[in-house]
């Protein structure tokens, strides 16, 4: 993957959405699309889409719009879709098992390659094709499988401790489903996913603004 320009975090979060919809358009046989058509489909305003795309140079032509195949190929490169990305899942409880069952079915280049849990009843088993290892095997397996991204779905009381272990193994990115805001050193990125917060935010918007669709 070629080096990409620095872009705002909000733009980066929209890139997979663009890629997913462009994949849908390409599979449907559509050859070109305008920013206004794209806006209507994915519910981001056209100005935001044009601004996002402008960070990468001239991706479209005035009066023509965007070539779907060219744009799809471009974002596939930006998102490194040609490389298989192995991900570790830490915590194979209810949420962890749901993620294992899903295992990125909408993405061809990401997969949960290994899961880890402290419960001896779960370790040594295979769930949805993914082996579940003990926590004692964490460093060995992450190193052997060259994993640098982990999903954290553990009890909040051990979230920081396990985060420290992940950092020691060389993990560079953590998708954190726990309510704890874990601390990591420079060079490690954490993305927090708090379902309770998301639902509370949704309720707030519904009660105060109605059911207006909002983008990222």
Curated annotation (Swiss-Prot):
Its main location: cytoplasm. NAD(+) binds at residues 91-96. It comes from the Bacteria. InterPro entries: CoA-bd, NAD(P)-bd_dom_sf, Rex_DNA-bd_C_dom, Tscrpt_rep_Rex, WH-like_DNA-bd_sf, WH_DNA-bd_sf. GO terms for cellular component: cytoplasm. The keyword Ribosomal protein does not apply. GO terms for biological process: negative regulation of DNA-templated transcription; response to redox state. Gene3D superfamilies: NAD(P)-binding Rossmann-like Domain, Winged helix-like DNA-binding domain superfamily/Winged helix DNA-binding domain. Modulates transcription in response to changes in cellular NADH/NAD(+) redox state. This is Redox-sensing transcriptional repressor Rex. It comes from Leuconostoc mesenteroides subsp. mesenteroides (strain ATCC 8293 / DSM 20343 / BCRC 11652 / CCM 1803 / JCM 6124 / NCDO 523 / NBRC 100496 / NCIMB 8023 / NCTC 12954 / NRRL B-1118 / 37Y).
């Amino acid at each position: 993957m070629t080096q990409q320009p620095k872009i705002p975090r909000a733009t980066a979060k929209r890139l997979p959405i663009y890629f997913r919809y462009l994949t849908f358009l390409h599979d449907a046989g559509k050859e070109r699309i305008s920013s206004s058509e794209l806006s209507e489909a994915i519910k981001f305003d056209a100005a935001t889409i044009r601004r996002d795309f402008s960070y990468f140079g001239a991706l479209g032509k005035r009066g023509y719009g965007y070539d779907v195949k060219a744009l799809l190929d471009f974002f596939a490169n930006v998102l490194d879709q040609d490389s298989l990305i192995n991900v570790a899942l830490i915590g194979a409880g209810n949420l962890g098992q749901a993620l294992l069952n899903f295992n990125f079915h909408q993405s061809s280049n990401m997969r949960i390659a290994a899961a880890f849990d402290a419960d001896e009843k779960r370790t040594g088993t295979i769930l949805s094709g993914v082996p579940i290892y003990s926590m004692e095997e964490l460093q060995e397996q992450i190193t052997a499988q060259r994993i640098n991204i982990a999903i954290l779905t553990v009890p909040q009381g051990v979230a920081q401790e396990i985060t420290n272990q992940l950092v020691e193994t060389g993990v560079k990115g953590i998708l954190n489903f726990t309510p704890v805001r874990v601390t990591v050193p420079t060079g490690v990125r954490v993305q927090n996913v708090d379902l309770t917060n998301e639902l509370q935010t949704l309720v707030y918007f519904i009660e105060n603004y109605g059911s207006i669709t909002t983008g990222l």
